[in-house]
Amino acid sequence: MDYVAQSPWIATLIVTATTYCTLRWVQYWRSWVNVPVVGRRGFLGSWISTILWTWEARGCIQKGYEKNKDFAFQVSTPNGWEVCICNDDMIKEYKNLMDDQMSALAVTSETFQAKYTLPGADWDAVHKLVPQPALAKSLMWLRNRAANDTDPYFPDFVRAFQRAFKEEIQVEQDGPFEWQSFPCFPRYSRVVAALTVKALLGSLANRPELIDLLCEYAEVIPLDGFFIALFPAILKPIVAFFCKAPRLSDRLVKVITEEIARRELENKHRIPEDMTDWMAQWVKDNPGYSIESAVVRVIATFFGGIHTTTQLTVHTLLEIATRPEYVDPLRQEITTALKAHGGWTKSAIESMTKLDSFIKEAQRFNPLDAASLARQATRDFQFSNGLKLPRGTWVFAPNGPMLFDESLYPAGSQFDGLRFWKLAEQTQRPHDYRLVTASSKYLQFGDGRHTCPGRFMAADEIRLIVAHTLFHFDIAIKNHGPRPRNTTFKKICFPDMSAEIMLRPRKLHGSEGN
């Protein structure tokens, strides 16, 4: 003991370890819920499960669903005990609750440490942000513009895409007619970024340095958020000071705020042309909110869109590249749509129902998140069946396992690119099976109060990118190899970020379209 007293580093280590174990013990009991446990039990066992959560998360959720699909189960994670709600009635009960009971933003905020990395998703500052309904209205405004044949929005959107595709993919559609390989994810992510910036920030999409900045920011947020979360609250501001995300966020806020000011000086009565214009006008009409509160919301929307949209785009391209039997029917549909609707119009994209089905099946077969409808109980909550959740509990629904449940999706372990097209034909309810349709059995875009409002814009981007690629090019995996395996991190499934595909320009006849 004298040695310990004379060695401050050892004393500090003992105090730190004791404090950590105490906090872990408190967290263990405070977040405990009276439902079955999947994984290791007990204080030590749950601690081991927490460490292994990074690798075992998706397997734990699958196992829990198979054993408890009519009720619920809990798993030990770095956030404490998280509860997976499998019962339909219980899911319906919590998914539409207000944020003062079950908050989706609180989960996002904690996951990405938004206070430091993503101010537009900071739960602690939610009262200062432009409200979620206003954000949803701005995205609905963009959706309505895209659907209006007399509005220049969608033709401008297509031109922005064509320019971005040429600059970023760097494979000329007019030849040479040879296979050219390149890394799929980084190239297509920049195309998605350019399209998203076009919708959110308009003319700023023409500034490559802004695309660079936004792409870099989107890459570092998950990394910095994960790193900051490793530290206790008292140390997080210090750790964040040495991370890139806060500095990049400040730079983006400055650039976009200056652009809004420039537009205001140029024309005080400017008619909104993009989401930033719309949000700036909303702030004018609703005193009490700052321009910065709108800007950080726009930036958070960009982050929310670029990763999910790029991942589904890449998954779809990898599936097409390794399933040649779908190329001709999809290509024929694209050609017919372009002829019938006069080129790359919104109506043409909407009429590509087989392509829509293929993309949705690629999403089902490669679910981004094994969980969906993630919420944090912002106060103690009790389900109608008596199950109690203490304040702070994280809950989610088993998105991944449901998508492979044979009772919901017959032959779910097999890829069927026309699955949803055939269901639409059989039931005569086409809108029930579109990519953008959310339901209690298909939670990829969420469901209920926080169904993703940006899914319509994302669907336009993905369908346009995939249709253009398939129409103008033959596609294959590099060296005509097999589909690269996905990688997982916690609940998340990613396509192989380093996977390379090959494109070869097609020799199109003049009658085939443009």
Curated annotation (Swiss-Prot):
GO biological processes: mycotoxin biosynthetic process
- Keywords for this protein: Glycoprotein, Heme, Iron, Membrane, Metal-binding, Monooxygenase, Oxidoreductase, Transmembrane, Transmembrane helix
What positions does the entry give for heme binding? Answer: C452
Please state the pathway this protein functions in, per its UniProt record.
Answer: Secondary metabolite biosynthesis
Q: Which GO terms describe its cellular component?
A: membrane
- Give compartment(s): Membrane
Q: State the organism named in the record.
A: Penicillium ochrochloron
One Gene Ontology term of the molecular function aspect? iron ion binding
Cofactors named for this entry: heme
Give a yes or no for keyword Glycoprotein in this entry: yes
Q: Where do transmembrane segments lie in this chain?
A: 3-23
- UniProt topology in membrane: Single-pass membrane protein
Function comment: Cytochrome P450 monooxygenase; part of the gene cluster that mediates the biosynthesis of the indole diterpenes penitrems. The geranylgeranyl diphosphate (GGPP) synthase ptmG catalyzes the first step in penitrem biosynthesis via conversion of farnesyl pyrophosphate and isopentyl pyrophosphate into geranylgeranyl pyrophosphate (GGPP). Condensation of indole-3-glycerol phosphate with GGPP by the prenyl transferase ptmC then forms 3-geranylgeranylindole (3-GGI).
The record, for Gene3D superfamilies, names:
Cytochrome P450 (1.10.630.10)
Q: Could you tell me the EC number(s) of this protein?
A: 1.-.-.-
Q: Which residues form a coiled coil?
A: none
Q: What is this protein called?
A: Cytochrome P450 monooxygenase ptmQ
Specify the domain of life of the species encoding this protein: Eukaryota
Q: Which residues are glycosylated?
A: N148, N486
Q: Would you identify the family this protein belongs to, as annotated?
A: Belongs to the cytochrome P450 family.
Keyword Heme recorded: yes
